[in-house]
Amino acid sequence: MPTLWSPSTQHHGSSSGSMSSPLRKSVRCAQMALSPCSSNIQPCDDRDSQGTAEWDSSSTSEDSDFEDSLRRNVRKRAAKRPPKAIPVAKHPKKQSHIVPGGNDKNKSVPPTSDLFDAVKAARSCAQSLVDEWLENYKQDENAGFLELVNFFIRACGCKSTVTPEMFKTMSNSEIIQHLTEEFNEDSGDYPLTAPGPSWKKFQGSFCEFVKTLVCQCQYSLLFDGFPMDDLISLLIGLSDSQVRAFRHTSTLAAMKLMTSLVKVALQLSLHKDNNQRQYEAERNKGPEQRAPERLESLLEKRKEFQENQEEIEGMMNAIFRGVFVHRYRDILPEIRAVCIEEIGCWMQSYSTSFLNDSYLKYIGWTLHDKHKEVRLKCVKALAGLYSNQELSSRMELFTNRFKDRMVSMVMDRESEVAVEAIRLLTLILKNMEGVLTSADCEKIYSIVYISNRAMASSAGEFVYWKIFHPECGAKAVSGRERRRSPQAQRTFIYLLLAFFMESEHHDHAAYLVDSLWDCAGSYLKDWESLTSLLLQKDQNLGDMQERMLIEILVSSARQAAEGHPPVGRITGKKSLTAKERKLQAYDKVKLAEHLIPLLPQLLAKFSADAENVAPLLRLLSYFDLNIYCTQRLEKHLELLLQQLQEVVVKHVEPEVLEAAAHALYLLCKPEFTFFSRVDFARSQLVDLLTDRFQQELDDLMQSSFLDEDEVYSLTATLKRLSAFYNAHDLTRWEISEPCSRLLRKAVDTGEVPHQVILPALTLVYFSILWTVTHISESTSQKQLMSLKKRMVAFCELCQSCLSDVDPEIQEQAFVLLSDLLLIFSPQMVVGGRDFLRPLVFFPEATLQSELASFLMDHVFLQPGELGNGQSQEDHVQIELLHQRRRLLAGFCKLLLYGVLELDAASDVFKHYNKFYEDYGDIIKETLTRARQIDRCQCSRILLLSLKQLYTELIQEQGPQDLTELPAFIEMRDLARRFALSFGPQQLHNRDLVVMLHKEGIKFSLSELPPAGSSREPPNIAFLELLSEFSPRLFHQDKQLLLSYLEKCLQRVSMAPSHPWGPVTTYCHSLHLVENTAEASSQGPPHSKKRCIEVPRRLQEEESSSQGESLQLNSGPTTPTLTSTAVKRRQSPRTVGKRQKGGPGPGPGPGPGPGPGPGPGPGPGPGPELICSQQLSGTQRLKMSSAPCFQIRCDPSGSGLGKQMTRLSLMEEDEEEELRLLDEEWQCGDKLLHSPSSPSEHGLDLLDTTELNMEDF
């Protein structure tokens, strides 16, 4: 590693060799701390031994001059100011601290809270605080320095202080040990992490104070007697403490101190260079013009600069070697983040000394950190370097070595890190030509389509600088000229179309436009160029390119008019600013002014293509339609209405008809002055459609056979009327009654084609809804009963259609029926609408059963019933899945709103585990809502679901050997999920769980084998399912249930000759005393004092981490892991007593490896396998028939080598699993509804962060 020392400092080594300065001691301590036994260091990476050895050797060779400089003795020159009345030694002889003078022996400890409280409150600026402290220091150096030391101690959260006597008699390590013992905080918080408004700004004020302290001392005390060596030595010692507060605060102070010293060193370097130039200029003068006095003065000044630089570099070396080298791998991520952030500042401010591979490697290694804060600091530090083209040119070796890691971070699991990683690669793209390959860039291209807006926008900026800027930027100089350049705009459009086509995400133009909006918005809002390219006859665009260009035009119009990202894209912004709203209004007006005259031309040109017409019609949603009136554009409105009518008559596609109906709805608002003209055009269109429908319907009703053309014509007319009935009230045309007669004929005779039935069902459904909207309190009872009669008749028609042979008709009837039943449910009268009570409708039992049967046949399909999934495309499978999810959601709504009996939910709950991936979120939400409605009934429904599945399994497989079947294993998993659904509120659900157990026991013994038979009862295996709910029981309830089971077994006419297996399993589950919920509610309270907590799977995680090598060709030596918390002060005897668990016989922590006193394996219980006596002490922790074995532990840990039973270990693992699954239940599956979830499509796979630090 290159040294920070000047080569001219070598001649000072011998003269200062006998000096014993505190800085030298701290340096030696820092060098000793580099050994593997250094404490509190977390391994940075899991690298192979070869890579580690390679870096060790390289580091040794590179750092040789640095090590030599560290071994040099730093000699400070004497102070140049007049001596004080009481001279104080600059470097004390005793240990490494300043010894107060004799006159200060009886002085009290100076007030230490004034400075700390001032920094905490931030009442005044840091400069005034430092100036005030400097005045106190100049009056009494010892008291002033002691006040500064105690300020840092108080900043750590320690209430103890350092007294003058402690400085006299104790070393640094002894002082820190004393402070550690006195560190008796009430909570785990300290000033840097404490919550509350009083501590909110403490860290900023603390860092500003340290910065200002060095800044104010750089021209006086820093080189003139100030004991900075002692302060650095103290901070180095505190940074190696096991107390987190000491380590965190002192590291932050040392790093900020180092940053300030780097700035001072930079200034000294500049002054030194300036002095050298002045000296050379003076020396090059002629003998007559040369001034010897000035040469001598410049030489003295250069010598002073050289000495000052040596002192600063000595301090910097001590901090770097004593603090940074250890703490950048600290177990606390906040400490690691501070180190990485500051070294990035050093590289930017003093690049000549710090910007080299010897320092860059620390950032490169830490790119693999497990915590996002540390990775984020690494990426931001590198971004500051790569943003400077001069600095980036010196980072070629680092870029080549760590480029793959930086590229992989664009798919980081944390979106903030991924965003900064993409911005970092954008800087590399700008300032380092040819570094990123095509494969590297392709990994970023697809990110423009993901749901996270920040990531997509960053990726859009990368795409802009990679693809568009080199071509478009070369054709224009400024932004204004670029917008006016037709050639640059046309080039941009062609490049955008090429990129869009190659991406293979042709349905997501809105996402692409939103991603490029921030960096290329001026291009995308050039609607003149977009429309001119579409309307030109010789534009040489293919059909696919025209379609994409229209999608881009519509997407850019939507983005400008609405001002927010498309649906499904996550953004942290809540509202627009005033400036953004003003720009949005301006863009909306300009959009309408330009496109209103051109929209009829576009519709006329692309009217034959349904995929082009539908998006063009959506453009009306983004116009300011008042412009038709204010700017006298009525003639363009007439042309638009003509094109609308032609589109409706020409097309039958649902998306085109819906877009046309919605466009006409936007124009038919009464507040517009042209409303009468648009309403007349709408009436003409509907009259045309209704006349055609009446004629074609008469032909159908009078004839039993229609040719294909007649069926197609009638179907097309019904589709058009249905689409317009959705957006417009067509009640006055009275087309509902003819459609009802048509549907009745279809149900009675089956002679109506299914193509006609689908739109007819929808049309009648919309007519009922429009009638409901006209009802008010003044509506007569006769009108209400007429509406209900129509609704009941339509429900009967839909019920008949549920048994139709066409699946599309069945699904359409189910959806419409579910919606109507929900609308006319008892919820209809909520909110003071009692006048609607006559309309409330309750379905009959037959209808409820048919709805449940339909759900089983169309939603919960077995894998073989889904058809040939391999031959169908992925998007078809996804659409079918969404359709099934809609059907299930409709049925669940009927359950939750009281339309159907809640017991019918068992048909849904019993498929919870088997179809968890497809419908898990819907069923979980239904289960949660059902429990909120009726807790007791919901628990019975869960038990009913298990009973139904068990009964079905017996009917299929018979009662023998059920527990080994895959179906029974799935049932156990389902029972476990049901148990987890109760949540951690054990006391709240106590009665429900006990009731569930009792009902389950009754069911298991409800059917008995014939008298004299040795077979088990057919339902006895149900007890194994019931055992999954046992961890939710209290110990008292377990004992009661054991007694209840014993009584039930005693009623069996023939006692078994050997215990039944399910009974044994169930009894074992009831013998477990502690579980997760009970331990959390009944366990002893945690001590507030900080102590060491070693995770149970620490060794497993450590061993597993060794197998995950990053395959890097470099890596630092991994130090020995040590704790970072203060151990609880208790004797081994006390620990042993705590671990015994209670009085009574049992395994205990014996003095040797053999088993302690306690009962051995004895005979098991009687035939019923019921233990009726109360267990106490450690007997509750083990079954009498369980085998014992020993756990080999660390011999140095007292009280840890106790015996454990296999059952107790199983219990611990099971309860840990239950705790984790409880958390999963509580947090829910948030990604299931995401349009770009990691489990779908592969567009949002942000789960590739390589973790190389174990989480302790």
UniProtKB/Swiss-Prot annotation:
Residue ranges, annotated region (Disordered):
1-110, 1096-1169, 1230-1256
* Subunit comment: Component of the meiosis-specific cohesin complex, which also contains the SMC1 (SMC1A or SMC1B) and SMC3 heterodimer. Such complex likely contains RAD21, or the meiosis-specific related protein REC8. Interacts with CCDC79/TERB1; recruiting cohesin to telomeres to develop structural rigidity.
Q: Where is the composition biased (Low complexity)?
A: 1-22
Q: What is this protein called?
A: Cohesin subunit SA-3
Which is one Gene Ontology cellular component term of this protein? condensed nuclear chromosome
Domain SCD residue range list:
324-409
List, as start-end ranges, the regions of compositional bias called Pro residues.
1144-1166
**Native organism taxonomy:** Eukaryota, Metazoa, Chordata, Craniata, Vertebrata
Role this protein plays: Meiosis specific component of cohesin complex. The cohesin complex is required for the cohesion of sister chromatids after DNA replication. The cohesin complex apparently forms a large proteinaceous ring within which sister chromatids can be trapped. At anaphase, the complex is cleaved and dissociates from chromatin, allowing sister chromatids to segregate. The meiosis-specific cohesin complex probably replaces mitosis specific cohesin complex when it dissociates from chromatin during prophase I.
Can you tell me which residues the record assigns to a coiled coil? none
Keyword vocabulary terms for this entry: Cell cycle, Chromosome, Chromosome partition, Meiosis, Nucleus, Phosphoprotein
As for PTM, the annotation reads: Phosphorylated.
Tell me where in this chain the PTM Phosphoserine is found. Answer: 1234
Q: Where is the composition biased (Basic residues)?
A: 72-83, 1126-1140
Mention any Pfam family matching this sequence: HEAT_SCC3-SA
GO biological process: one example: homologous chromosome pairing at meiosis
**Which GO terms of the molecular function aspect are on file?**
chromatin binding
Bias (Polar residues) ranges: 1113-1125
Similarity section: Belongs to the SCC3 family.
What does the record say about tissue specificity? Testis specific.
InterPro entries for the chain: ARM-like, ARM-type_fold, Cohesin_Scc3/SA, HEAT_SCC3-SA, SCD, STAG
Principal localization reads nucleus
